[in-house]
Structure formats: structure tokens, C-alpha cells
């Protein structure tokens, strides 16, 4: 007899806020990415802090010093846990991601569809690398699926980017 899969219907984020002090000032393309990532994240995600019991949860993301802060709370605002993660593993990935994003946003205005597609494939590859790194850094702390990691990586990039 196999163990039944856990019911994760309540293990999700219902609201996300970004620390205003941490947000890098950026252009409309980056702000658009941030808004889409927050919307998509709240619509569909898996987010289960280890040992916290069932959600749903709210998440406040910020940068404090040299660390990424995940302030996790219950829907009613009761604190669950705050995780501080080193930014070091993300620095190169975020830098590469924004370099290729700049190329992508320039290309969509002037380049051929083949060139745009090639740049976009590279952009998605770097984004996937950042998402996997985030999943690894949260292992044993918060269980997330890959799509949730992708959306969270977008938000981390927006916070980290100082344009």
C-alpha cells in the first residue's frame, strides 16, 4: 500500500509584497515582468514551509544586507518563519539574466524573429538556472515546485536589479 500524496490545496501563497526599500528602480519592461510574476504566482503556486502546517501563506520578499529575506506569514498575518538566504549564489545568474533581458527587449523592437527566438531561448535557460538554484537554496526550508520557483526568481531579480 502506497502513501497517499499530501493535499497541497492550501499550501500556497495568497499574497506577495516586495520590500519597497529593496526594489531596484527599473524601466517599464522590468515593472511589467514583476507585475506578471506576482499575478501568476498568486494564481498558481505550491508553497509549503517545512513544519509550518497547512497554509495559505503570505510572503514578503526583501533584501536585507547581503541576504534575501522571505518573511512567511499566515493569511491572517501571524508570523510563521523568516528565512534569510545568501545572495551570493544568485549574483552571477541575475547579472546574466538582466544582460540577456536587455538584449531581448532591444531585439523585440528591431531584430528578426529568428534572432528574437534565439535570445529568448537563452533568457529562458538562465531563468531556469536561477529557478533551480532557488529550489536548492530552499530545500529543507520551503517546498516549492518549479513553476513557483520560476516566478519567485523573477521577483528576486527585480529586487536585486539596481539598473
Swiss-Prot record:
Signal peptide: none
InterPro entries xrefs: UCP032146 (IPR008321)
Highest taxon of the lineage: Bacteria
Transmembrane segment boundaries: none
Classification via HAMAP family: UPF0262 (MF_00678)
Family: Belongs to the UPF0262 family.
Name of this chain's protein: UPF0262 protein Rpal_5021
Protein species of origin: Rhodopseudomonas palustris (strain TIE-1)
Amino acid at each position: 500500500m502506497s502513501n497517499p500524496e499530501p493535499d497541497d490545496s492550501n499550501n500556497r501563497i495568497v499574497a506577495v509584497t516586495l520590500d519597497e526599500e529593496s526594489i531596484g528602480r527599473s524601466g517599464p519592461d522590468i515593472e511589467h515582468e514583476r507585475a506578471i510574476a506576482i499575478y501568476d504566482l498568486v494564481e498558481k503556486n505550491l508553497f509549503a514551509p517545512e513544519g509550518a502546517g497547512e497554509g495559505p501563506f503570505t510572503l514578503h520578499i526583501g533584501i536585507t544586507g547581503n541576504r534575501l529575506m522571505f518573511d512567511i506569514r499566515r493569511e491572517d498575518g501571524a508570523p510563521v518563519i523568516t528565512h534569510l538566504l545568501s545572495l551570493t549564489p544568485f549574483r552571477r545568474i541575475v547579472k546574466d539574466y538582466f544582460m540577456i533581458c536587455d538584449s531581448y527587449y532591444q531585439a523585440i523592437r528591431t531584430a528578426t524573429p529568428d534572432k528574437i527566438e534565439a535570445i529568448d531561448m537563452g533568457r529562458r535557460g538562465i531563468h531556469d538556472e536561477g529557478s533551480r538554484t532557488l529550489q536548492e537554496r530552499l530545500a529543507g526550508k520551503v517546498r516549492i515546485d518549479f513553476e513557483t520557483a520560476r516566478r519567485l526568481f523573477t521577483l528576486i531579480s527585480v529586487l536585486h536589479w539596481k539598473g
